[in-house]
Amino acid sequence: MLLLQILFALLQRYRYKPHSLSDGLLLALHFLLFFRALPKS
């Protein structure tokens, strides 16, 4: 999925920015909540 690719790309960036790790985890949590809200296809 495109959104998953975007998420992974952002996580790759956060890997090199330790001070932004918490922001990356929050972003990942929001993505998980978003996917859970999507209707199952």
Swiss-Prot record:
May play a role in host modulation. This is ORF3c protein. It comes from Severe acute respiratory syndrome coronavirus 2 (2019-nCoV).
